Amino acid sequence: MHGAKVHLNGANPLTDLPSINAVRDIREATCGPVGAPNVTNELSENIILTSLDDLHNWARLSSLWPLLYGTACCFIEFAALIGSRFDFDRFGLVPRSSPRQADLLIVAGTVTMKMAPALVRLYEQMPDPKYVIAMGACTITGGMFSADSTTAVRGVDKLIPVDLYLPGCPPRPEAIFDAVIKLRKKVGNESFQEREKMLQKHRYFSVPHKMKRVQSQVTGAYLNASTQKQALSPSQEIPLEDQNEATKEIAQ
C-alpha cells in the first residue's frame, strides 16, 4: 500500500508509545531514585540561610590573632588581659609573635622616630585584611612627650592607618575589651566587593622626618615671677616667700 507506512517490527510508532507512568518509572530507575524531601519542623530549625560574606566575616571576627607591639606602660594593662581574671581567650584572641601570622596590630606606648621604620615594616609584613588599634594617649597623639620631645612621633596614624583609637593613660582592661568588641562589629559588616574600596593606604611617612628647629617654649621666665606674701590658710600664718628671698637663702 502506498499510503501507509509499516514499522519493521510490525508496531506503529504513533500508537504504541509508552505511557506517562512508564516514562516516570524509567526515569526514576535510571536518574537516581531519590524521593521527595519531607521538610519537618526539626529539619527547618537546623537550616541557616547565610551568605559567603557573613560566613567569612564570622570566621575572621571569631579568630583575631593580635601582634602585641608594646613600648611603654600601656602594655602592662594589656598584659593583665592574658590572666584568668579577664580571660581574653573567649574572644578568640591568640597572641602571635610573627607578623605573618597576625591580622591585628595593637600598638601600646610611645613610638619614637627610631622605632617608626620597624613598626611600618611589621605592619607591611601582616597579611590582608589587617587591622590596627592605637592604645593609649602616647600612641594616639604623643601624650606627655608631644610638647617638647624631639624623638616622639605625634600619633601612630602618621605611620600606619589606624582602625580604632583607644584613649587613656593607660586604658583599663575593660576599655580594651570594648575596643575589641567594636572592632568585631566592624569586621562583621565588611564585604568582598567593598574590600578594594576600603583598603587603607599609608597617610604619609618620610625618612628622615625633616623636623626643623624652633624656639623653645620653656624659657624659665615663670621662675622669676614674684609670689604674693599671703598665708596658706587663715588658720596658719605661714607666709609664702618669693623667688628672690629663696635665692638669697640658698646663697647664704
UniProtKB/Swiss-Prot annotation:
The record, for InterPro entries, names: NADH_UbQ_OxRdtase-like_20kDa, NADH_UQ_OxRdtase_20Kd_su
Q: Cite the residue spans of the region called Disordered.
A: 225-252
Which terms are listed as keywords in the entry?
4Fe-4S, Iron, Iron-sulfur, Membrane, Metal-binding, NAD, NADP, Plastoquinone, Quinone, Thylakoid, Translocase, Transport
Q: What does this protein do?
A: NDH-1 shuttles electrons from an unknown electron donor, via FMN and iron-sulfur (Fe-S) centers, to quinones in the respiratory and/or the photosynthetic chain. The immediate electron acceptor for the enzyme in this species is believed to be plastoquinone. Couples the redox reaction to proton translocation, and thus conserves the redox energy in a proton gradient. Cyanobacterial NDH-1 also plays a role in inorganic carbon-concentration.
The protein's location, in the record's own words, is: Cellular thylakoid membrane
Question: Where this protein primarily resides, as one coarse class?
Answer: membrane
User: Does this UniProt record's set of keywords contain Coiled coil?
Assistant: no
| Cofactors named for this entry | [4Fe-4S] cluster
- Report the protein name in the record: NAD(P)H-quinone oxidoreductase subunit K
Q: Which GO terms describe its molecular function?
A: 4 iron, 4 sulfur cluster binding; iron ion binding; NADH dehydrogenase (ubiquinone) activity; quinone binding
What is said about its interaction partners and assembly? NDH-1 can be composed of about 15 different subunits; different subcomplexes with different compositions have been identified which probably have different functions.
- What family does this chain come from, according to its entry? Belongs to the complex I 20 kDa subunit family.
Per UniProt, what is the name of the gene that codes for the protein in this document? ndhK
Enzyme Commission (EC) number: 7.1.1.-
* One GO biological process term: aerobic respiration
What does the note under cofactor report?
Binds 1 [4Fe-4S] cluster.
Top-rank taxon, per record = Bacteria
Q: Where is the composition biased (Polar residues)?
A: 225-236
Any one GO CC term of this protein is: respiratory chain complex I
Q: How does it sit in the membrane?
A: Peripheral membrane protein
List the catalytic activities from the record.
a plastoquinone + NADH + (n+1) H(+)(in) = a plastoquinol + NAD(+) + n H(+)(out); a plastoquinone + NADPH + (n+1) H(+)(in) = a plastoquinol + NADP(+) + n H(+)(out)
Pfam families reported in the protein's UniProt record: Oxidored_q6
Asked whether the UniProt record includes NADP among its keywords, one would answer yes
Source organism lineage?
A: Bacteria, Bacillati, Cyanobacteriota, Cyanophyceae, Synechococcales
UniProt enzyme class: translocase
- Record: residues binding [4Fe-4S] cluster: C73, C74, C138, C169
* Organism the protein comes from: Prochlorococcus marinus (strain MIT 9211)
